[in-house]
Swiss-Prot record:
HAMAP family: Poxins. The gene is OPG188. Nuclease that is responsible for viral evasion of host cGAS-STING innate immunity. Cleaves 2',3'-cGAMP which is produced by host cGAS following recognition of intracellular foreign DNA and blocks the subsequent 2',3'-cGAMP-mediated activation of TMEM173/STING which normally spreads to adjacent cells and activates the interferon and NF-kappa-B immune responses. It comes from Monkeypox virus (strain Zaire-96-I-16) (MPX). Residues 237-503 are annotated as: Schlafen-like. The lineage of its organism: Viruses, Varidnaviria, Bamfordvirae, Nucleocytoviricota, Pokkesviricetes. In some poxviruses, the poxin is expressed as a poxin-schlafen fusion protein. This is Poxin-Schlafen. GO terms for molecular function: 2',3'-cyclic GMP-AMP binding; nuclease activity. Homodimer. Transmembrane segments: none annotated.
Length: 503
């Protein structure tokens, strides 16, 4: 029998190997072919995976053989030999490679009482001393420097995994290397497929949705859920209900299993979706009444059109046109907004002849809240204009009455606001499908607002004009993650995110 440590299967009375406890001590070095659900897979020659468990303050690590499999296998799936005998279960994974856990090659069994252990990828060409890696000359000088110190008790172990050699070093409190082991085998570190989340704490919903996204984008895995509250399963289901927007992606990839004090969410990635699992795309489009964030399918359609067309050409300039009073079509509103944008001064309380449209947005804010609102709202509003038809944002015009209000600030503060606007626009990520790769084109003006009889004023309306962009403008990086080999969750950049789309 084989028991996965990820599911609480560690038993000190059984044989223990990286990630599993078992009733038999199986030497997995002797196999060249294994079978999972009647499909055969070859063991990779001369390449291994360093796997470990940390259970009950015990570290169990070893170099294990691995096999290549392009299908998703879940933790605990049985692995058989060619005669049909079960020899292990699925534990660790690195991309399309799965470890075969049991008696492997070089191993490390430690008591973690009072010591830590760290794992590193050893970069090609680098040498190692203690807890650092660098080019050989730098490491040589480091070793000379540290040799002058007296050795102290070991406080940390460092496991270095390289393409041709693996090493284990130990260090004292000063970073002096106390001991070293070398294994003349090339290996990889697994992509961790177990994430621990506590519910009932601050940001638990964010942590849960982030973990779901990261695991689905990394081939699948398990989330171990604990809670201070008694009914962990009840609390978990409440949190899952609150992130229902993710269920369109994960509903058929998720299974919740109740344990005594914790729950396990088992997930697999079907690789059939054209999009990565994404909490928020941060791609916005402008409608008549609002700036709306695209969901994954809307983003796919929008980006597909851009990719097929190779980007968009600039919109032609508006032609001068005499229009009767009361006309409220989009083109007329845009012309009125252009005229308003070019005004040299405004009167407090005057009525603006146009309201919000697909090209125009009004907003009013106090001087005290001005920079905060710009930071919070500018990226989504301006990127939505850039992704649609371009447009105008007027800060200081009441959204309901359409009257000029403005905001009153000093000259120095106005310069800070201007720099903020420039900074936030320049930070907007653009993913290009065209050859020109042009920047976002915009103009910003501060129009003075006078009260009747005043000759001077410190009241302004901020007017920002954004042209339609050639390609896709993001308000921020998409909220879409993956697991790296260190066990950290990393967010995809916009370019990385788009590159993973199956157009």
């Amino acid at each position: 029998m084989f028991y996965a440590h990820a599911f609480g299967g560690y038993d000190e009375n059984l044989h223990a190997f990286p990630r599993i406890s078992s009733t038999v001590a199986n030497d997995v070095r002797k196999y060249s072919v294994v079978s999972v659900y009647n499909k055969k897979y070859n063991i990779v020659k001369n390449k291994y995976m360093w796997c470990n468990s940390q259970v009950n303050k015990r570290y169990i690590g070893a170099l294990l053989p691995m096999f290549e499999c392009n299908e998703y296998l879940q933790i605990g799936d049985p692995i058989h030999d060619l005669e049909g005998n079960q020899i292990s279960i699925v534990t660790y994974r690195h991309k399309n490679y799965y470890a075969l856990s049991g008696i492997g090659y070089e191993s490390l069994d430690l008591c973690l009482e009072g010591v830590g252990i760290h794992h590193h990828v050893l970069e090609t060409g680098n040498a190692v001393y203690g807890k650092v890696q660098h080019e050989y000359s730098t490491i040589k000088e480091k070793a000379k420097e540290m040799n002058a110190l007296k050795p102290g008790p070991i406080i940390d172990y460092h496991v270095w995994i390289g393409d041709c050699v693996c090493q284990v070093t130990t260090v004292d409190v000063h970073g002096k290397e106390i001991m070293r082991m070398r294994f003349k085998r090339g290996a990889v570190l697994p992509i961790p497929n177990l994430v621990k989340v506590k519910v009932g704490e601050e940001n638990d919903t964010i942590n849960l949705s982030t973990s779901i996204s990261a695991l689905l984008n990394s081939g699948g895995g398990t989330i171990e859920v604990t809670s201070k509250e008694e009914r962990v399963d009840y609390v978990l289901m409440k949190r899952l209900e609150s992130i229902h927007h993710l269920w369109s992606v994960v509903y058929d990839h998720l299974n919740v299993v109740n344990g005594e004090e914790r729950c396990y969410i088992h997930m697999h990635s079907s690789h059939q979706s054209p999009m990565l699992s994404t909490v928020k795309t941060n791609l916005y489009m402008k409608t008549m009444g609002a700036c709306l964030q695209m969901d994954s399918m809307e983003a796919l359609e929008y980006l597909s059109e851009l990719k097929e067309s190779g980007g968009r050409s600039p919109r032609p300039e508006l032609q001068k046109f005499e229009y009767p009073d009361g006309v409220k079509d989009t083109e007329s509103i845009e012309r009125l907004a252009e005229e308003f944008f070019n005004r040299s001064e405004l009167q407090a309380g005057e009525s603006v002849k146009f309201g919000n449209s697909i090209n125009v947005k009004h907003t009013s804010v106090s001087a005290k809240q001005l920079r905060t609102r710009i930071r919070q709202q500018l990226p989504s509003i301006l990127s939505s204009f850039a992704n649609t038809k371009g447009g105008y944002l007027f800060i200081g015009v009441d959204n309901n009455t359409h009257k000029v209000i403005g905001f009153t600030v000093g000259h120095d503060y106005l310069k800070l606001v201007e720099r903020d606007i420039e900074k936030y626009i320049q930070k907007l990520p653009v993913v290009h499908f065209c050859k020109k790769k042009e920047d976002i084109k915009y103009a910003c003006r501060f129009i003075k607002v006078y009260k009747p009889g005043d000759e001077t004023t410190s009241t302004y309306v901020c007017a920002i004009k954004v042209e339609r962009c050639c390609c896709a403008v993001f308000a921020d990086w998409p909220e879409s993650w993956y697991m790296d080999t260190s066990g950290s969750m990393k967010k995809y950049s916009p370019d990385e995110w788009v590159s993973h789309i199956k157009f």
